[in-house]
């Protein structure tokens, strides 16, 4: 059977390996997953209770207006319901943006190394990809590439903070850059980790209400998969002006998010104790990863996320990843990004200590 030609140029996205699979494959009793940037404390208690109370409604289709979650997000971000679209993860909203703006006759712009799904989704539309030479977000390079290909580029991705490297930019730098972009070019700010960046440095905080008030061509993406611990329920959102949101609704299938996910997301937003605990643990434990890197002369990029990336000169990241798997520790090998590096999710103190102990032995 023949398929569309663009599939010949696509690679499968490689998600983090599953705990049960690794336990069986390597014969280890205890497996620690530090690969997919999930919340190490699990699901928020308020969301768990909400799921218990609503489990008997799983047979019902969700309220397709999603009014409860939209109203909660609108209040949180000081925007209107009409400025919000809910997706099955922020990934789905990325798809909406790409299918709304890109085709085989235009292009998009992104950092040299960033979230892989941008390119995968865009290639489905036949769009051309321009990447900066810098692996991180160098806005001078972004500006030069945009100016050189302005007629082609109809969408720009800014992943802030960046996955899988962790760097971030000051909000003032971002807004200055957007001012130089034509109104017909959609600027997507993927803020999946922005709560972490804002906690670490207020200058990195991006406020969607201010962005969409100043710019008609900005889409702000948020997710419940990271800070809010709902990765398994697949729920995220986009915030933009009403014209953009209305266009996206033409691409959205009805009932695209489950009623349980919608309810749990509302409860998660209200669980301040859980999010505070997550953020405080993340950056106190992050410091231990920095100290470990310094001790072993491992290069890092200062991270504003819930993960840290280790870069190696002589050691091979694939070999290191395999040795960690044999010890029951799952991390993300970044060889598929063209990097000799590994990305490690910041876990609990117990998980991190086990990583340090085993990785110290491996590096000797």
Swiss-Prot record:
Keywords, sorted A to Z: Amino-acid biosynthesis, Aminotransferase, Histidine biosynthesis, Pyridoxal phosphate, Transferase
Alphabetized NCBIfam families for the sequence: hisC
Gene3D superfamilies named in the record: Aspartate Aminotransferase, domain 1 (3.90.1150.10), Type I PLP-dependent aspartate aminotransferase-like (Major domain) (3.40.640.10)
Annotated metabolic or biological route of this protein: Amino-acid biosynthesis; L-histidine biosynthesis; L-histidine from 5-phospho-alpha-D-ribose 1-diphosphate: step 7/9
SUPFAM superfamilies assigned to the protein according to its UniProt record, in alphabetical order: PLP-dependent transferases (SSF53383)
Name of the protein: Histidinol-phosphate aminotransferase
Top-level enzyme category: transferase
UniProt EC number: 2.6.1.9
Residue numbers carrying N6-(pyridoxal phosphate)lysine: 226
């Amino acid at each position: 059977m023949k398929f569309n030609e663009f599939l010949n140029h696509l690679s499968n996205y490689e998600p983090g390996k599953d705990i049960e699979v690794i336990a069986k494959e390597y014969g280890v009793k205890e497996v620690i997953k530090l690969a997919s940037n999930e919340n190490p404390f699990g699901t928020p208690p308020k969301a768990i209770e909400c799921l218990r109370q609503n489990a008997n409604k799983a047979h019902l289709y969700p309220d397709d207006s999603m009014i409860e979650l939209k109203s909660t997000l609108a209040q949180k971000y000081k925007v209107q319901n009409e400025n919000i679209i809910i997706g099955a993860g922020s990934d789905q909203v990325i798809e909406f943006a790409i299918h709304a703006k890109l085709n085989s006759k235009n292009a998009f712009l992104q950092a040299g190394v960033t979230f892989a799904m941008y390119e995968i989704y865009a290639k489905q539309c036949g769009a051309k990809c321009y990447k900066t030479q810098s692996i991180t977000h160098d806005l001078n390079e972004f500006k030069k590439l945009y100016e050189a290909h302005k007629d082609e580029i109809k969408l720009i991705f800014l992943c802030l903070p960046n996955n899988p490297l962790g760097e971030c930019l000051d909000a003032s730098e971002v807004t200055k850059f957007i001012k130089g972009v034509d109104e017909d070019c959609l600027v997507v700010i993927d803020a999946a980790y922005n709560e972490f960046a804002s906690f670490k440095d207020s200058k990195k905080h991006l406020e969607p209400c201010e962005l969409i008030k100043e710019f008609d061509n900005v889409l702000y993406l948020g997710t419940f998969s990271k800070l809010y611990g709902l990765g398994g329920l697949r729920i995220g959102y986009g915030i933009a002006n009403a014209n953009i949101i209305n266009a996206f609704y033409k691409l959205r299938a009805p009932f695209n998010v489950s009623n349980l996910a919608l309810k749990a997301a509302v409860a998660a937003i209200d669980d301040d104790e859980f999010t505070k605990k997550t953020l405080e643990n993340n950056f106190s434990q992050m410091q231990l990863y920095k100290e470990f890197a310094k001790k072993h002369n491992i290069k890092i990029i200062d991270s504003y996320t819930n993960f840290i990336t280790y870069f190696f000169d002589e050691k091979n990241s694939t070999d290191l990843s395999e040795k960690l798997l044999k010890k029951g520790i799952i991390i993300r090998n970044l060889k598929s990004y063209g990097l000799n590096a590994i990305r490690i999710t910041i876990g609990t103190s117990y998980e991190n200590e086990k990583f340090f102990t085993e990785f110290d032995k491996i590096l000797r």
